[in-house]
Structure formats: structure tokens, C-alpha cells
A protein has these predicted regions:
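Compact nucleic-acid interaction/catalytic patches
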Residues: 19-25, 29-66
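C-terminal terminal-subdomain/extension
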Residues: 1, 66-113
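Short, charged beta-turn/beta-strand-edge "cap" motif at the junction between a beta-strand
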Residues: 14-18
Length: 113
């Protein structure tokens, strides 16, 4: 399975260990470099999406509109970054635009620097 940075995939985030961790089967943005994505590395870094929208929540969240197989407008949860095993990827839904991916990086930098 070929997974690329900026793609939105349906992933299995169960089980979770804490109440404040996102679980379920849900969409997520691949945020790992393609150098690692296209290697034999066993995990990928993702940012989960939520359809429970919160207006004005930047830099914690970034809104994206529905597209392709992503059926609802969603918020990318910037602060819920995590690595998941490659076996947790179910199917590709869509991808971010170059501008959206750039904005994700800006928001990620804002909450981590």
C-alpha cells in the first residue's frame, strides 16, 4: 500500500489508553515524510480528523471541506499527532491541497515551538 504525506486515509485508532486520546475508525491526515512513507518503516505519523466542528479553534484545529470520499467537513486535530502501525490504514479517502498542507505545518509549528 502506497501512502503519501497529505493524503487523508480512513484509519483504525482503537484501542486507546486514555479518555483524552481519539479512538474509533476515522479519517486522518498522513503527516510523515514520503521518504519514510515509502520505506519499510513500520509506522506512519498521522493527524486525526473530527466531524465535531469547533469554529475559531486555530491553532489547535484546522477546518477542511468535504471532498472525494471524505463525506463531511472536518477539523484536523493538530495536537492529537500520533504514530500508528501501517496495518491500521484501511482506505484512501482524499488528499489535502498544497496550500492546506502548508497551513497544517504552520499550525503544527505554532503549537510545538
Amino acid at each position: 500500500m502506497m501512502v503519501c504525506k497529505g493524503e487523508i486515509w480512513l484509519v483504525n485508532l482503537n484501542p486507546v489508553k486514555k479518555d483524552n486520546e481519539m479512538g474509533k475508525i476515522k479519517p486522518a491526515v498522513v503527516y510523515q515524510s514520503n521518504e519514510l512513507n515509502h520505506s519499510d518503516y513500520p509506522t506512519k505519523i498521522i493527524l486525526p480528523l473530527s466531524t465535531s466542528l469547533i469554529d475559531g479553534a486555530e491553532p489547535i484545529r484546522m477546518r477542511i471541506t468535504k471532498r472525494d470520499a471524505l463525506e463531511q467537513d472536518s477539523d484536523i486535530i493538530i495536537t492529537q499527532i500520533r504514530a500508528i502501525d501501517n496495518d491500521r490504514f484501511i482506505k484512501k479517502l482524499a488528499h489535502l491541497t498544497h496550500q492546506e498542507l502548508k497551513k497544517v505545518k504552520e499550525l503544527f509549528d505554532e503549537v510545538t515551538l
